[in-house]
């Protein structure tokens, strides 16, 4: 790897554990996605939750340079963080915002808001009137077409958009919705949500209201059906090089971006019958070489992976043994008798011909790769690698 972009106050090589972000892979993914879209369709890079654990500022800057048009975050502080880093691209707050403090911050930092109900629209307009904000705030109208989360029911789309259009201080930038089952091989529910979205847009057009932009597709829908691309797609997981579902893997070539690394801090020989870690969940069946790795569940390695996971050392798979502790975990290093303290262990990522992915962890944990990625804590420095 040619160079490192430091994302923490300490030198990357001095760390007990860290997360490497492959910025070339990230750029590749954005460019591949852009090529998959029509020239008229914009790409929003979703960088909420610290860019799914990858580091929001570095990811946002790289994604924009690679061709993303705008950014999506969940909260106002996430948007402010990007503005403070000097990012000028449009930033949409995908989550709910209601308080005067949130609305004032959106205005101050030139963010864009999701409006999901008439009540919220009125609160926004009244608050902006109170603070005497001069220019209108771009807002994105959220419709509920089947997710049963944020948004006004699609059947009331016309009257809802008409209300927002008439309110002072609000400028409608788009109408959008979110799909609940786009990653399913069965497209039935997605098709129904698509139909509802189309009917909602027809309602709005009947009233003579022009909407600058429409967006519906997440990563899965972007890969599954070009009819859902509209004017913009909101892509999160695919930007980070993961596929939302196995049946979508042949649609586009993506490269995983994240690599989680830690160091060997101690190596010892243990006798047969020796218990390892809390609760002695693992008992050595024979004499073994044991190595301690400087990463644990406080860093984002789930304790439920205890005795279920492997790590990579020198391009080989090595089993983890015993209960994963807060700051450390143990591995069976018997296959590497000359293993030395200070050597690097890969928990997620690639070494040689072997690789371990977030999907592997998700399968072992009976969860989803999104949760795995978002679990890596801030005490792991993010290091951008070119």
From Swiss-Prot:
Pathway: Amino-acid biosynthesis; D-alanine biosynthesis; D-alanine from L-alanine: step 1/1. CDD domains: PLPDE_III_AR. GO terms for cellular component: cytosol. GO terms for biological process: D-alanine biosynthetic process. InterPro entries: Ala_racemase, Ala_racemase/Decarboxylase_C, Ala_racemase_C, Ala_racemase_N, Ala_racemase_pyridoxalP-BS, PLP-binding_barrel. It is an enzyme of class 5 (isomerase). PROSITE patterns: ALANINE_RACEMASE. Keywords: Isomerase, Pyridoxal phosphate. The keyword Cell cycle does not apply. The modification N6-(pyridoxal phosphate)lysine is found at residue 48. The active site is at 48 (proton acceptor), 278 (proton acceptor). It holds the Pfam family Ala_racemase_N. Its cofactor is pyridoxal 5'-phosphate. It catalyses: L-alanine = D-alanine. GO terms for molecular function: alanine racemase activity; pyridoxal phosphate binding. Its EC number is 5.1.1.1. SUPFAM superfamilies: Alanine racemase C-terminal domain-like, PLP-binding barrel. Substrate binds at residues 149, 326. Belongs to the alanine racemase family. HAMAP family: Ala_racemase. Catalyzes the interconversion of L-alanine and D-alanine. May also act on other amino acids. This is Alanine racemase. It comes from Nostoc sp. (strain PCC 7120 / SAG 25.82 / UTEX 2576). The lineage of its organism: Bacteria, Bacillati, Cyanobacteriota, Cyanophyceae, Nostocales.
């Amino acid at each position: 790897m040619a160079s490192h972009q430091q994302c923490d106050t300490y030198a990357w090589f001095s760390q007990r554990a860290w997360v490497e972000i492959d910025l070339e892979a990230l750029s590749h993914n954005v460019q591949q996605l852009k090529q998959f879209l029509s020239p008229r369709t914009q790409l929003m890079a979703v960088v909420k939750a610290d860019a799914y654990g990858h580091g929001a500022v570095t990811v946002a800057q790289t994604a924009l340079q690679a061709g993303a048009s705008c950014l999506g975050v969940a909260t106002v502080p996430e948007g402010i963080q990007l503005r403070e880093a000097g990012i000028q691209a449009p930033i949409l707050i995908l989550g709910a915002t209601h308080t005067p403090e949130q609305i004032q911050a959106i205005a101050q930092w030139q963010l864009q808001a999701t409006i999901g109900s008439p009540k919220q629209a009125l609160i926004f307009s009244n608050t902006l009137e109170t603070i005497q904000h001069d220019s209108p705030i771009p807002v994105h109208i959220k419709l509920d077409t089947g997710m049963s989360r944020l948004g006004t029911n699609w059947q009331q789309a016309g009257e809802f958009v008409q209300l927002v259009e008439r309110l002072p201080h609000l400028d409608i930038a788009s109408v959008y919705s979110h799909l609940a089952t786009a990653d399913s091989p069965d497209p039935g529910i997605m098709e129904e949500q698509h139909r509802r979205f189309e009917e909602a847009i027809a309602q709005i057009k009947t009233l003579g209201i022009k909407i600058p932009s429409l967006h519906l597709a997440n990563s899965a829908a972007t890969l599954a059906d070009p009819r859902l691309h509209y004017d913009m797609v909101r892509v999160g997981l695919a930007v980070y090089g993961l596929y939302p579902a196995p049946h979508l893997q042949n649609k586009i070539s993506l490269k995983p971006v994240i690599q989680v690394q830690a160091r060997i801090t101690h190596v010892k020989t243990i006798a047969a019958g020796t218990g390892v870690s809390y609760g002695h969940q693992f008992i050595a069946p024979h004499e073994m070489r044991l190595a301690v790795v400087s990463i644990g569940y406080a860093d984002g390695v789930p304790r439920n992976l205890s005795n279920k996971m492997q790590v990579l050392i020198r391009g080989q798979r090595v089993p983890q043994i015993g209960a994963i502790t807060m700051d450390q975990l143990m591995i069976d290093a018997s296959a590497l008798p000359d293993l030395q303290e200070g050597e690097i262990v890969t928990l997620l990522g690639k070494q040689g011909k072997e690789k371990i992915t977030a999907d592997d962890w998700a399968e072992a944990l009976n969860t989803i790769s999104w949760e795995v990625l978002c679990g890596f804590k801030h005490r792991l420095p993010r290091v951008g690698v070119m």
